[in-house]
């Protein structure tokens, strides 16, 4: 009996708390207070991957530092013989990769072109 009364009392308290929160929400925001946010949620996986891919890789830097520690100072002639190769950005087009020809996207057909092709098929 006591457990039932205790549960009922807690339920009443929770309902009163919720009603007070609803009252303050209605006073401050009105009916819009119960509507969902119109903004879409952020795509956090996309943002994290974009940040990781745009920042220079820490592994490559650590690897280069370790190699530099192992090898003693090189002479100036050896440094000039082995220049570092620059890595191209994966999303930027390099002139070598594109070749000499530049391609344009396909042309949109007008409604007249569509009708002419249909009449030619018949």
From Swiss-Prot:
**What highest taxon heads this organism's lineage?**
Eukaryota
Enumerate the residue ranges of region (Disordered): 48-122
Residues with Phosphoserine modification: 104
Record PTM N-acetylmethionine, positions in chain: 1
Q: Which segments does the entry list as coiled coil? A: none
Residue ranges, compositional bias (Basic residues): 84-96
The protein here is known as Protein POLR1D, isoform 2
InterPro entries found in the cross-reference section: POLR1D-like
Identify the species of origin.
Homo sapiens (Human)
Query: Top-down, what is the taxonomic lineage of the species of origin?
Result: Eukaryota, Metazoa, Chordata, Craniata, Vertebrata
Where is the sequence biased in composition, kind Basic and acidic residues?
57-83, 110-122
Among its keywords, does the record have Phosphoprotein? yes
Cellular component, GO, one term: nucleoplasm
Q: Which UniProt keywords apply?
A: Acetylation, Phosphoprotein
